[in-house]
């Protein structure tokens, strides 16, 4: 559980007499202050350090005369962060910043009438657990309020990077709320204590007059999460945001850390097979519910139809012929989006036919595995596919001495791991792939033992000798081409 608190401190013109602030109209202004240690019962002491404040974009109506703006992010570990904050400029225009760390979401919704008039004055900095706008010389403000409870967490890094990249190019935060009190300051504290069915408000308090000026924090019927979720994909590893339209061109790799997102079978075929060389096989073959399996939730035939409609596929594997860097190949690609890539009678039949065709035509064979195992809706018929495929591979490998490359992606489990997944002459795994026979939950519930974290990851299994290679997705095609040439398979031209 975590909580994020956002603080906005504004020191007004009345401080100039007490703290020697020099007044300057529509130009560079200076404020000499240093924020020292404070407790919950007293306000900050101000003295010391000079900060120059310049007008935003050279516009008079955005002047920062004698005001320093500190935008801080303070980390706490108590409550769930899930709120939306309203920021308003001195023209009354507003924008919202939404954070949902539990669901890995950061969003900004702008309601400005003219976005071009807004710009950031300097940069957004991160220093000792606090992030500041520094309008002086672009260096981080050294604040003696070092927060020893602030940690360099993925969630913190994610939010900091999101705010930094966006606000630097778009937004000028310019609150225009200044009290007339001689020694007052405005302190906005947005506490995150909202449940799923509640929306709460937080106030900006004038401590000298004990009056409250309310800023709306949470909004009823505000669902910005759903509004923009279709545009972005968040990395599970670094929490970075990836724009969906660019993700395909980057072969579903995270721009920040290179994490491998899941891919559909069609996307993998597009990556591995040369353009205009793909020729599908047995694409009209589909299951007929051989054991008439019916569940309380949904009949098997209806479930098959729903996945066919959703994915555009007839089954959980695509098989066919193509060329890889000009080398003719036979390739089968499983699709986890179709019933978890489960292996039923049709999947087994399509893969067996592909192997037999490659045997007759003396073609190298590639099978990309992504499966949860045998399909329970087809009972023992699905288990029979393990033996059928293994038998066809025996003839292909042992009798014809041809090359079979097995590529294991995340996840590869169950009957696929126990059969053709581990029978390759060369076994290649993608980085961070989840590969196992029985899943972690099944093992723990059956044996009542805790499965160590990472014990079913590709890197750990590689150290134990289960694979030959771990190849990143962007290098896979070139590596396969070199392997085929090494085994005397050459391009047609």
UniProtKB/Swiss-Prot annotation:
This is Acetyl-coenzyme A carboxylase carboxyl transferase subunit beta. Keywords: ATP-binding, Fatty acid biosynthesis, Fatty acid metabolism, Lipid biosynthesis, Lipid metabolism, Metal-binding, Nucleotide-binding, Plastid, Transferase, Zinc, Zinc-finger. GO terms for biological process: fatty acid biosynthetic process; malonyl-CoA biosynthetic process. Pfam families: Carboxyl_trans. Residues 231-493 form the CoA carboxyltransferase N-terminal domain. Acetyl-CoA carboxylase is a heterohexamer composed of biotin carboxyl carrier protein, biotin carboxylase and 2 subunits each of ACCase subunit alpha and ACCase plastid-coded subunit beta (accD). It comes from the Eukaryota. The gene is accD. HAMAP family: AcetylCoA_CT_beta. It is found in: Plastid stroma.
């Amino acid at each position: 559980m975590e909580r994020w608190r956002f603080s906005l401190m504004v020191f007004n013109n009345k401080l100039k007499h007490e703290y020697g602030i020099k007044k300057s109209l529509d130009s560079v202004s200076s404020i000499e202050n240093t924020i020292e240690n404070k407790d919950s019962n007293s306000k900050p002491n101000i003295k010391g350090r000079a900060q120059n404040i310049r007008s935003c974009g050279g516009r008079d109506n955005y002047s920062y005369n004698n005001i320093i703006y500190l935008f801080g992010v303070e980390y706490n570990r108590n409550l769930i962060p899930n709120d939306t904050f309203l920021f308003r400029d001195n023209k009354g225009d507003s924008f919202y910043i939404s954070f949902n760390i539990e669901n890995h979401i950061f969003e900004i919704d702008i309601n400005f009438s003219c976005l071009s008039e807004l710009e950031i004055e300097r940069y957004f900095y991160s220093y000792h657990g606090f992030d500041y706008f520094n309008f002086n010389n672009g260096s981080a403000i050294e604040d003696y309020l070092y927060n020893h409870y602030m940690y360099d967490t993925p969630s913190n890094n994610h939010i900091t990077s999101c705010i930094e990249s966006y606000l630097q190019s778009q937004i000028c935060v310019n609150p225009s709320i200044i009290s007339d009190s001689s020694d007052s300051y405005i302190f906005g504290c947005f506490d995150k204590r909202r449940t799923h069915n509640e929306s709460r408000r937080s106030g900006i308090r004038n401590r000298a007059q004990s009056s409250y000026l309310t800023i709306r924090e949470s909004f009823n019927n505000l669902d910005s999460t759903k509004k923009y979720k279709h545009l972005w994909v968040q990395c599970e590893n670094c929490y970075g945001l990836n724009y969906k339209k660019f993700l395909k061109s980057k072969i579903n790799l995270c721009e920040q850390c290179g994490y491998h997102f899941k891919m559909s079978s069609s996307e993998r075929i597009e990556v591995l097979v040369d353009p205009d060389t793909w020729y599908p096989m047995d694409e009209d073959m589909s299951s007929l519910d051989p054991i008439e399996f019916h569940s309380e939730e949904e009949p098997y035939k209806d479930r098959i139809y729903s996945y066919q409609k959703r994915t555009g596929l007839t089954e959980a594997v695509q098989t066919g012929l193509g060329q890889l860097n000009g080398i003719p190949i036979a390739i089968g690609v499983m699709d986890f989006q179709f019933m978890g890539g489960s292996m039923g009678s049709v999947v087994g039949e399509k893969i067996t036919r592909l192997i037999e065709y490659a045997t007759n035509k003396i073609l190298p064979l590639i099978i990309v595995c992504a499966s949860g195992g045998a399909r329970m809706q087809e009972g023992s018929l699905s288990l029979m596919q393990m033996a059928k495929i293994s038998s066809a591979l025996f003839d292909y490998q042992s009798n014809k001495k041809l090359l079979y490359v097995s590529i294991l992606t995340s996840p590869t489990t169950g009957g696929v791991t126990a059969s053709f997944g581990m029978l390759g002459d060369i076994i290649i795994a993608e980085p961070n792939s989840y590969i196992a026979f029985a899943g972690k939950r099944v093992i723990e519930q059956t044996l009542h033992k805790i499965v160590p974290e990472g014990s079913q990851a590709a890197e750990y299994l590689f150290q134990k000798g289960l694979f030959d290679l771990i190849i990143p997705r962007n290098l896979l095609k070139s590596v396969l081409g070199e392997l085929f040439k090494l085994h005397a398979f050459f391009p047609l031209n």
